[in-house]
């Protein structure tokens, strides 16, 4: 039993490990976010000073991004579904796949230890120098966080190489690239983004490490360095990263919507592929829109404003194609469909606030206020997380062969929907009123919206616990699925439920596409 899980080279077992790790990390990250909202629930300080507060904020961001969303979306859904959807017997490099997973537990341990030794890394997830220099953050906290990022980065790069190789080499004989399922495409593009952006982050944080410990001056003006260089390097990774977090979600939503609509494929399949490629490409040329306040040239700001707005075009193509897929169907409000509809609506809202922030002139005012927090939590907490939830309840019968309770799932969806909206909608108002980010306290003027926001976070907590209870109930009661209720336009539903340990002993052949 021990050997099965420690030395596994089976994509399904490794996918399950990723799910368990991601759910655990998600609970840690959620606890941290509740500490943040408890601190901000009333004026005055509750937990302590801004150092401990910012340490909590930093850990919350890193855990949610690197140990919850990425492991579940790419590691969990990617590992499980990509080989099944391609008709491949496993991933291209099964042992490397195992290593990708086992680099994550040491990585999260380093991250957690960074917040419990010395004063913690209170730098925000961006780890900007000079705040992250050895003067402002003496001690080993930031160094531990850097090593944690290195491990998580190596894990993701190895995973990316694995997915790219699998997708290029392990398709059925006569399946062309444009015939691949959209989820496989989305994971492939995500892997490419990871492969191109993570080495830049590794370079940036390695330079920061030597600045802190070996007396170099990459980011120290006293020695001829420039802290702005760090920001450029970080955001050259950081912006593709946010698309890495959402693209697999796009793929899952495409599958769920077409299946639940009873359509054989998504509307504008090829357009969806090109839209994802465009989003991936454009994601690399807009990074400095995170830096409108550092004093760039007017023409530079004009370029980054325009380029950022162009991303709205392929994103809009995706939104309208999903709506077109839904068109003319009698919508069946199943739990996975509810998550998808919630995703499309809330992701659009988050996207619109993004277009507002893309204007460099307006962003000077809104930068580092709660407006930005509201924007990215709409696309992450209601985009990425809704996609994860929708994908989970949609494919859970395939992964386990068991049924979840749909009635409880609907209650859970509406609880979560109310919770996240109540948490993050008021933050738009706080941002417009000028409440800055990353402070543990605020003037009394902002009290009312903060109380409402914190109330929403407690509702989300109840929803999260309800989800865990639903999964537990399903595993205890073991309502075994006799046959899938799905359209078999996606090949993964032709498996046994759950699939056999080795699903494709002979390779499938494509016919009548």
Swiss-Prot record:
Cofactor binding notes: Binds 2 heme A groups non-covalently per subunit. Binds a copper B center.
Positions of Fe(II)-heme a binding: 60, 377
A molecular function (GO) term: heme binding
Binding site for O2: 243
Keyword list, A-Z: Calcium, Copper, Electron transport, Heme, Iron, Magnesium, Membrane, Metal-binding, Mitochondrion, Mitochondrion inner membrane, Respiratory chain, Translocase, Transmembrane, Transmembrane helix, Transport
Transmembrane spans: 16-36, 62-82, 101-121, 144-164, 182-202, 233-253, 267-287, 304-324, 337-357, 384-404, 413-433, 451-471
Protein name: Cytochrome c oxidase subunit 1
């Amino acid at each position: 039993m021990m050997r099965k899980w420690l030395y596994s080279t089976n994509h399904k077992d490794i996918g399950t490990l990723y799910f368990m790790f991601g759910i655990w990390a998600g609970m840690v990250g959620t606890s941290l976010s509740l500490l943040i909202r408890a601190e901000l629930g009333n004026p005055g300080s509750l937990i302590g000073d801004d150092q401990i507060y910012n340490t909590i904020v930093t850990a919350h961001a890193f855990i949610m991004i690197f140990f919850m969303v990425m492991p579940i979306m790419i590691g969990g859904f990617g590992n499980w579904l990509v080989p099944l959807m391609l008709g491949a017997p496993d991933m291209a490099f099964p042992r490397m796949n195992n290593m990708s997973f086992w680099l994550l537990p040491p990585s999260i341990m380093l991250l957690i230890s960074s917040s419990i030794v010395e004063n913690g890394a209170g730098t925000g997830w961006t780890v900007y120098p000079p705040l992250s220099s050895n003067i402002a953050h003496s001690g080993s906290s930031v160094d531990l966080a850097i090593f944690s990022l290195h491990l998580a980065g190596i894990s993701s790069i190895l995973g990316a190489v694995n997915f790219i190789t699998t997708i290029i080499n392990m398709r059925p004989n006569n399946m062309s690239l444009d015939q691949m399922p959209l989820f496989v495409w989305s994971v492939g593009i995500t892997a490419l983004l990871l492969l191109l952006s993570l080495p830049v982050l590794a370079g940036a944080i390695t330079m920061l490490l030597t600045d802190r410990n070996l007396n170099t001056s990459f980011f120290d003006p006293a020695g001829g360095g420039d802290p702005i260089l760090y920001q450029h390097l970080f955001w050259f990774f950081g912006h593709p990263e946010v698309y890495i977090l959402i693209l697999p979600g796009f793929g899952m939503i495409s599958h769920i919507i077409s299946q639940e609509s009873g359509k054989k494929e998504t509307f504008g399949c090829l357009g969806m592929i090109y839209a994802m490629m465009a989003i991936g490409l454009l994601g690399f040329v807009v990074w400095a829109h995170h830096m409108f306040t550092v004093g760039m040239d007017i023409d530079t700001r004009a370029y980054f404003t325009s380029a950022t707005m162009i991303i709205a075009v392929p994103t809009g193509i995706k939104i309208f194609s999903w709506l077109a897929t839904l068109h003319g169907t009698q919508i069946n409000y199943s739990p996975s469909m509810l998550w998808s509809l919630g995703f499309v609506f809330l992701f659009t809202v988050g996207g619109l606030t993004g277009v507002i922030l893309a204007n460099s002139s307006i962003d000077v005012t809104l930068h580092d206020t709660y407006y930005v927090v509201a924007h990215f939590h709409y696309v992450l907490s209601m985009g990425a997380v809704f996609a994860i939830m929708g994908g989970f309840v949609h494919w859970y019968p395939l992964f386990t062969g068991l049924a979840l309770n749909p009635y409880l799932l609907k209650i859970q969806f509406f609880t979560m929907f109310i919770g996240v909206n109540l948490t993050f909608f008021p933050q738009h108002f706080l941002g417009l009123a000028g409440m800055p980010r990353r402070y543990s306290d605020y003037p009394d003027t902002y009290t009312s919206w903060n109380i409402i926001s914190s109330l929403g976070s407690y509702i989300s907590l109840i929803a999260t616990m309800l989800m865990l209870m639903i999964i537990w109930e399903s595993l205890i009661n073991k309502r075994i699925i006799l046959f899938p209720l799905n359209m078999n336009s996606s090949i993964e539903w032709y498996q046994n439920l759950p699939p056999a340990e080795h699903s494709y002993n002979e390779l499938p052949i494509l016919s009548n596409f």
